[in-house]
Swiss-Prot record:
Its cofactor is Mg(2+); Mn(2+). Gene3D superfamilies: Malic enzyme, N-terminal domain (3.40.50.10380), NAD(P)-binding Rossmann-like Domain (3.40.50.720). A divalent metal cation binds at E246, D247, D270. Homotetramer. This is NAD-dependent malic enzyme. It holds the Pfam family Malic_M. Belongs to the malic enzymes family. InterPro entries: Aminoacid_DH-like_N_sf, Malic_enzyme_CS, Malic_N_dom, Malic_N_dom_sf, Malic_NAD-bd, Malic_OxRdtase, NAD(P)-bd_dom_sf, NAD_malic_enz_proteobac. Its EC number is 1.1.1.38. The gene is maeA. The lineage of its organism: Bacteria, Pseudomonadati, Pseudomonadota, Gammaproteobacteria, Enterobacterales. NAD(+) binds at R157, D270, N418.
Amino acid sequence: MEPKTKKQRSLYIPYAGPVLLEFPLLNKGSAFSMEERRNFNLLGLLPEVVETIEEQAERAWIQYQGFKTEIDKHIYLRNIQDTNETLFYRLVNNHLDEMMPVIYTPTVGAACERFSEIYRRSRGVFISYQNRHNMDDILQNVPNHNIKVIVVTDGERILGLGDQGIGGMGIPIGKLSLYTACGGISPAYTLPVVLDVGTNNQQLLNDPLYMGWRNPRIIDDEYYEFVDEFIQAVKQRWPDVLLQFEDFAQKNAMPLLNRYRNEICSFNDDIQGTAAVTVGTLIAASRAAGGQLSEKKIVFLGAGSAGCGIAEMIIAQTQREGLSEEAARQKVFMVDRFGLLTDKMPNLLPFQTKLVQKRENLSDWDTDSDVLSLLDVVRNVKPDILIGVSGQTGLFTEEIIREMHKHCPRPIVMPLSNPTSRVEATPQDIIAWTEGNALVATGSPFNPVVWKDKIYPIAQCNNAFIFPGIGLGVIASGASRITDEMLMSASETLAQYSPLVLNGEGLVLPELKDIQKVSRAIAFAVGKMAQQQGVAVKTSAEALQQAIDDNFWQAEYRDYRRTSI
């Protein structure tokens, strides 16, 4: 459902003069009217011409096109964001296909690596371990009293790039930009946070420009006590906030999620968001082929928290489609750097133990090795779906893809690792190795593949199709928790918008131009499920839709009226 046009009420603000021009949430730049310039002491501080936001956006677009590298474009857009947020979001929404890869993956990876080098202006909250005793004071320093979404990282596992220390702040900033651009959540309601617990990246520790705490990472009890202090301070300051954990290391991601998901409204996008968008993609791909996900055999390369999170959600979906839990688990095979996860493998992590295959059931496999490699698994399982979340480039080799295609006429191959440099195989290679028969979805953006004069569109399995809608649904419904069923409803809704399902051709996921429409639909489904599950107050469907409309922020300037502090 499209948002209804709503009349914007005037905004009463106490700021004036240069202070107002330095306030990104309120600054209009050359779009301040003459009346506003008189009322807010801006006469002479701006050029004479009063411009519209579209005229400003056109100038910014021309300037943007003058930059030759993606990182320079990223820096330019961040500068606009730190100067005039409304213009930033108008510009991004006007050119979302072009700019999403620049403000987020893959370019944000380089921005994180070079964070201290390209730093210009502070955004968000930096909480170092050294300042742990000032946690409440730090959060009180945030001027926004009505924060509704926080994205927090400790910078230890940034995309596939590893430990970036406080450089990881680029991820919460980019993620929240998408909450606004795709999900209509007002930037005034968002807060990026980095927990600076040190870094084990020696290159950063040796870098004279590094702006973080120069200390090895704290671990174990010290680490968990520090995170707990942060959570308790957030609950005290903003008790109804949605907290998203982002890019925490595997050893901490699942324990933190399990510890806090029933204490504060929270989720981990790397685990749950990735799982939701992947399952939505697989539901759509299965339906487009005239079947169900429960009929497919699935092999994973990568058995970390993200891979296992996806696997568990696939199992839940196939149970919804009629499989028993045992039958559902027998169709999912997890491979990591030590081979196929089996019940005979030592030192498994707790979240991996339910995803093992029984070694006794593999006695008839065609292999001479005790370690069952990805090729061994593909050769013996004959999977319909191959998913890569390894963070390592090139592991989907030609031999593996051709072996899969030998037994599956229409394989679904999803190299999901980010950024582009870490992808398990390129779409170009996968299409060629399967004679044009593979359905490919990637974690990073790729251009369409041209093979034998035919164009193959490549869907980006982008979490941005999921988390903005979840955030909007939580805010609109007032949900106190995010349940597994709410995530499943998001996946199902995403699948319903697949052009491949709706039209029999095209992408398996919607186009970016439709992402706000999809986010609104997901918000409604998530809010409705929250009400059904008792984590939100029940209302009518009309009331929920109205709440979504009311909370959907759009990049338009409002009239200002002067008031005193």
